[in-house]
Amino acid sequence: MIGSLKSSQPKKGSDLSKASAPLPPAPVIMTCFGHCGIGLGAETYRRLLLDVGADPLKPTIKTSKDEDRVLKRYGSTILRFPQKYGSEEIPLIPRALLIDLDPRAANLILQSYPDLFALREKHVIHGSGGAARNWAEGRTRFTQEMKAKYDIQNQLDALSPEPVRGYTIPFAMGGGTGSSFASSFIEFIKTNSSDPTTVATFGLLPEFGWDPVIFESATINIVMNLEYQVKYSDCSILFSNKVLRELAHKNEKKIQKIPSIIDDLPKEHEVGWKDYKGMNLIAANSIAMFIASFARETEWDMSNYRTWLTTKRPKFAIPWVIPVIPEENQWGKELLGGKNNTMEGIMEKVGKKEDGLLFDIDENDIRSHGGEKDSCCFLVKVKGEFDLKEREALKRVVKDKFNIQDSRMIFVKIPIMEGEPANVTILVNTKAIGPKILEIASEAEESWTAYKDEYGKWGLSTEEFKKGLMDVVHQFS
């Protein structure tokens, strides 16, 4: 049986209490909801494991050198370190939970990566079938099936006996399970925790006419999910599948050369996953940068995002990544070229238009609807100089697109590891995203009359829907 730590500090005399190992920050748990959330979360976790020097297929400690490397990179933020129990090889436990009503996605990942998810069933919560693309059904079944069948708090405690610093939560917003379960979970965390836990959500808006969603019900699902994010999420980051797909297609040749969690799935199960490989790789890169901004040795904490966004309207951010796709030999021992991990390399990517906003936003909306209080947060991982000249260069990049004042720009410098390429992710908070969301809200309002009985039998009344709709319209107007 794998042992557990009862506090964030290792026991006296244990192998982990080395003078060279810093006191790690409190853990962060990734909870992935629905088919989309599980795929994106698994890809992000693979990236994070590489970040801290662990094998993404089988994270273990074999030697004291392995231990030092992972600890110095704050691997305990995303990995649970069990005590030794006889074997020379100690599995490192990902602090990740895969949750879905349909058991297929979570079980496929679990079966395909038995050496990654060492706690087996403790990494998975699933029901007996999907939520029929119905947010109200998913919310009701979260209570009836998930809370009744599983003690969710015990599952979280198994992944992190230590006090939890925060939760990162990827999911799709247009479907039934991901949208509703993410909503219910963040409500559960915020109403059942006495600790100041920070919740960060990563919601993917569907591409209508491409993704397998039902247009009318999806707009209702998105509105209700957005309302819950407004109420319970401290840092809400939005992606557009349309933009992710376009960027993945544009960078198809590069993506083919980048290893992915999907590469190791059984060939007969690639349908439904392979088409999203590039999209997940692009989004996962920005989520990993978000986590690195507070998991590595920086002057920034996860809770700072709460303070940044709490007074904003809308209190949402969209990611801008430079580059869209990392170098092909990322985390390799020999990084190609001399500029790939410097600011000079970053600016070259911008010049070649190898950067990209990951949200479907119109240039006219940026000019017409951007607000005077728009702001942004630069997450910067580069080697070498990052002083006045480098900051001014990034400011100019942003000002070419958004009217953001210098005083409303935040810079977070992230330590870069050996073998890592440079990376800049800019989280942009702007009123210019309002028109896209308000368009969806308008469609949801028109669709409600036809769907009110179907949603009503699962507990979503017209009064509750209209209140949610009004809250979302107010937030994004």
Outline where the language-model segments fall:
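Terminal, contiguous helix-loop blocks that mediate binding/assembly
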Residues: 2-477
